[in-house]
UniProtKB/Swiss-Prot annotation:
Assigned protein family: Belongs to the DapA family.
Main localization category: cytoplasm
UniProt protein name: 4-hydroxy-tetrahydrodipicolinate synthase
Gene (name only): dapA
Residues of the site described as Part of a proton relay during catalysis: T54, Y117
Gene source species: Prochlorococcus marinus (strain MIT 9303)
GO molecular function: 4-hydroxy-tetrahydrodipicolinate synthase activity
Length: 302
C-alpha cells in the first residue's frame, strides 16, 4: 500500500460518483429515475455520491430542484452511503444558505466550488470559504478547485489556512496536474483528504498522495475503478496500471466535449434515459455519439 494513501483520512470513501441529473421528456428533473440511478451507482461500487455538482448541471438547476434532488438521493441510498451536496456559488450568502440547507436535508458533506466569474483574490477566497465553514460547523466540506471553469485557482497556502476550520476536511483537485496534490500535501500535510477530479489522473494522483476520486466514468465502470483503487492500495501496481490503461479510451471519450454532455449520452446508450442536458448545453452530436458507442462496445469486450 502507498504510505501516503494509508496515512491520509478518507472522510467520504475512495470512489465518489459525480452524479448526473436525469431530466424527463419535458426537461423536468426526473426524481424517480434519480433515485434508481443512485442505488445502481452504489451497487456498482460507489462509496458515495456527489449531487448537484458540475456533472449534475448545478448552474441550470434551481435551488428548489437541488434540495429536492438531494432529499431523494439521500433517501434512496440510505444512511450507509455518503451523500455530498454541491452548494457552491459565486455569492457567499447563497453558498451559506445552500450549505446550511444541505445539512438540514441530511447531507454528509458539501462540495463547495471556488467562486466563479467574479475572480476574487486569495484573501477573498479565504473569507468566502471560512464564512461557509463557520455557518455549518458540523458539516464536512470538500473544497473544489477547477480553474478551467471558474477563472481563478485556490492556492495551497490558502487551503492550509482554511484548515483552521475543523470541518474543512477534503479537496477536489481538478486543475489537471498531479503537482496540485503534491503542493497541497506540502502545505497541508496528510490530514487533508485530496480527491482527484479527473478519472484519467486518478492513478497518477494516488501515487503522490490522493486518496480517491470524484468520478464521472463510474456511471459506467464503477466496479473497474474500484478494482483499480483496491489493486493500487494492495500493492498490485501492475494490475492497477492495466486497469488505468484499459479505461483510458473511455476517460477520453467522456471529455471529448463539455462534461456532462458525453456521459449523459453514454448513459442513454447504456439504457438509462437520463435525457439531454439543459441549455446552453446541447446533446452530443451524431458523429461523437457514434464514436462513443464504439468505445463502449470495445470496452464491453475487454
Amino acid at each position: 500500500m502507498s504510505s501516503a494513501a494509508e496515512s491520509s483520512p478518507t472522510p467520504f470513501g475512495r470512489l465518489l460518483t459525480a452524479m448526473v441529473t436525469p431530466f424527463d421528456a419535458d426537461g423536468c428533473v426526473d426524481l424517480a429515475l434519480a433515485g434508481r440511478l443512485a442505488r445502481y451507482l452504489v451497487d456498482e461500487g460507489s462509496d458515495g455520491l456527489v449531487v448537484c455538482g458540475t456533472t449534475g448541471e448545478s448552474p441550470t438547476l434551481s435551488w428548489q430542484e437541488q434540495h429536492q434532488l438531494l432529499g431523494v438521493v439521500r433517501q434512496a441510498v440510505g444512511p450507509g452511503v455518503k451523500v455530498l451536496a454541491g452548494t457552491g456559488s459565486n455569492s457567499t450568502a447563497e453558498a451559506i444558505e445552500a450549505t446550511t440547507q444541505a445539512a438540514a436535508v441530511g447531507a454528509d458533506g458539501a462540495l463547495v466550488v471556488v467562486p466563479y466569474y467574479n475572480k476574487p483574490p486569495q484573501e477573498g477566497l479565504e473569507a468566502h470559504f471560512r464564512a461557509i465553514a463557520q455557518a455549518a460547523p458540523e458539516l464536512p466540506l470538500m473544497l473544489y478547485n477547477i480553474p478551467g471553469r471558474t477563472g481563478c485557482s485556490l492556492a495551497p497556502a490558502t487551503v492550509a489556512r482554511l484548515m483552521e476550520c475543523p470541518n474543512v476536511v477534503s479537496f477536489k483537485a481538478a486543475s489537471g496536474t498531479t503537482d496540485e496534490v503534491t503542493q497541497l500535501r506540502l502545505q497541508c500535510g496528510s490530514k487533508l483528504a485530496v480527491y482527484s477530479g479527473d478519472d484519467g489522473l486518478l492513478l497518477p494522483m494516488m501515487s503522490v498522495g490522493a486518496v480517491g476520486v470524484v468520478s464521472v466514468a463510474s456511471h459506467l465502470v464503477g466496479r473497474r475503478l474500484k478494482a483499480m483503487i483496491e489493486a493500487y492500495l494492495n500493492g498490485q501496481g501492475a494490475l492497477a496500471l492495466s486497469y488505468h490503461e484499459q479505461l483510458q479510451p473511455l476517460f477520453k471519450a467522456l471529455f471529448v466535449t463539455t462534461n456532462p454532455i458525453p456521459v449523459k449520452a453514454a448513459l442513454e446508450l447504456s439504457g438509462w434515459p437520463v435525457g439531454s442536458p439543459r441549455l446552453p448545453l446541447l446533446p452530443l452530436d451524431p458523429v461523437m455519439r457514434d464514436a462513443l458507442s464504439n468505445t463502449l462496445t470495445a470496452l464491453c469486450q475487454t
